UniProtKB/Swiss-Prot annotation:
Pathway: Cofactor biosynthesis; NAD(+) biosynthesis; NAD(+) from deamido-NAD(+) (ammonia route): step 1/1
Descriptive protein name: NH(3)-dependent NAD(+) synthetase
Residues involved in ATP binding: 48-55, 204, 233, 255
NCBIfam families: nadE, PRK00876.1
C-alpha cells in the first residue's frame, strides 16, 4: 500500500510534518479541478497575490490544476503596504505566467475613512499621533505565563522614537475594526473580477491560520475554495519549493503587511515562529505527550502547556468566524 502524501513520522521532530509534495500537489489539483468545474461550474480562479508564501503557493496550485490562462491574479496595495509585497507578487505572477491587474485600494479606503477612523482611536491614547507617525499592534507571548495575551499599541514618532501603550478595549476594537476594512475591500475587488470573468475566488489560509482564526470574517476569510487549509505552514513551504515559488518569497518572514510599522505574524497573533507552532498544534491534534512536544520544540513542559492553552483559547474565541449565518430553522 502506498503511503498517504500527508503521512507523518511516528516520532515528533523537525521532520514530523514532511510530506510527499508531488503526490500532495496532484491530490490538491484534482480536488480543485472538480470543485471549480463540476461543483461550482466556473471557468477559472481569481487570487489576490500578496507576495507571501501562502498566496504564492495557491497561485501556483491554481495554474497547475487549471492552466495559467484560467487564473487571474490581483495585486492590491494600499497606503500602508510594503512595496516589496507588490514586487514579489508580480514576480510570482511572472514565474507562473499569470495574467493580472494592480488595484490600488488606498483611495477607496481613505474615502471610507479607514485611516482617519484608525488614527482617531489612536489619538485617544497618543494625542500627538498624525502625519509622519507609524503604528502596529503586538501581543504579549503566552510563554510569559500571564494567562492571557495582552495587546499593546506600538507607535513610532517622526524622529524614529518608539513608545508602547496599553489600550482600553474600546480603542483596541476601534483600531482593529478600521484596519479590517483593508481585508474586506480586497475581497470585494476579488469578487468583482470573479463575477466579470465567471471565475471562483481562491482563499489562501494554511492550517495554522484556519485553525486559530487568523483571518477577517467576510475579508480574507471569504472564498469559494481553500485548497491549503489542511496543510501546516511547514508543509506549505515544502509545496512552495516543489512548485518553484521564487526563493525571495520563500525567504520572506511571514508578515501581516497591514500596519505602517513592519510586523510579523508572530508579533501580532501567534505565540511562536510557525515551525514550532506547527509542531505544537500537530502534537495537540494527535494527542502526543507534553514531554515529547517540549523536546521537539525546545520548550519547557510548562511553555508547551501554555501554548496549548493559547491554542484552545483562540479556537474558542474565533469559532464565530467559521460559522455560516445562523437561521431560526433549516431552509434547504
Amino acid at each position: 500500500m502506498n503511503p498517504s502524501p500527508l503521512s507523518i513520522h511516528s516520532a515528533l521532530s523537525s521532520d514530523a510534518l514532511r510530506i510527499d509534495a508531488a503526490a500532495e500537489v496532484d491530490r490538491i489539483a484534482q480536488a480543485m479541478r472538480d470543485q471549480v468545474r463540476n461543483k461550482m461550474r466556473r471557468r477559472g480562479l481569481v487570487i489576490g497575490l500578496s507576495g507571501g508564501v501562502d498566496s504564492s503557493v495557491c497561485a501556483a496550485l491554481a495554474a497547475y490544476a487549471l492552466g495559467a490562462q484560467n487564473v487571474f491574479a490581483i495585486f492590491m496595495p494600499e497606503n500602508d503596504s510594503d512595496p516589496e509585497s507588490l514586487s514579489l507578487g508580480q514576480e510570482v505572477a511572472k514565474a507562473f505566467s499569470l495574467e493580472g491587474a494592480i488595484e490600488d485600494i488606498g483611495s477607496a479606503l481613505a474615502a471610507m475613512g479607514c485611516y482617519e477612523r484608525r488614527d482617531d482611536f489612536i489619538r485617544q491614547v497618543e494625542p500627538a499621533y498624525g502625519s509622519g507617525w507609524s503604528c502596529k499592534v503586538v501581543i504579549s507571548s503566552p510563554l510569559a505565563g500571564e494567562g492571557y495575551a495582552l495587546s499593546t499599541l506600538v507607535l513610532q514618532a517622526p524622529d524614529g522614537s518608539q513608545t508602547r501603550h496599553r489600550m482600553p478595549a474600546s480603542v483596541y476594537l476601534g483600531i482593529v475594526a478600521a484596519t479590517n476594512m483593508k481585508q474586506r475591500t480586497r475581497k470585494q475587488m476579488e469578487y468583482y473580477h470573479a463575477d466579470r470573468l465567471n471565475y471562483a475566488v481562491l482563499g489562501t489560509p494554511n492550517r495554522l491560520e484556519y485553525d486559530q482564526g487568523f483571518f477577517v470574517k467576510n475579508g480574507d476569510g471569504a472564498a469559494d475554495l481553500k485548497p491549503i487549509a489542511h496543510l501546516y505552514k511547514s508543509q506549505v513551504y515544502q509545496i512552495a519549493e516543489y512548485l518553484g515559488v521564487p526563493e525571495e518569497v520563500r525567504r520572506r518572514p511571514p508578515t501581516t503587511d497591514t500596519w505602517s510599522l513592519t510586523q510579523t505574524q508572530e508579533e501580532f497573533y501567534f505565540a511562536l515562529p510557525y515551525d514550532r507552532m506547527d509542531l505544537c498544534l500537530h502534537a495537540l491534534n494527535e494527542g502526543l505527550g507534553v514531554e515529547e512536544t517540549a523536546k521537539a520544540t525546545q520548550l519547557t513542559t510548562d511553555q508547551v502547556e501554555r501554548v496549548w492553552l493559547d491554542i484552545h483559547s483562540k479556537r474558542k474565541a474565533t469559532r464565530p468566524l467559521h460559522l455560516a449565518p445562523l437561521l431560526v430553522q433549516p431552509v434547504f
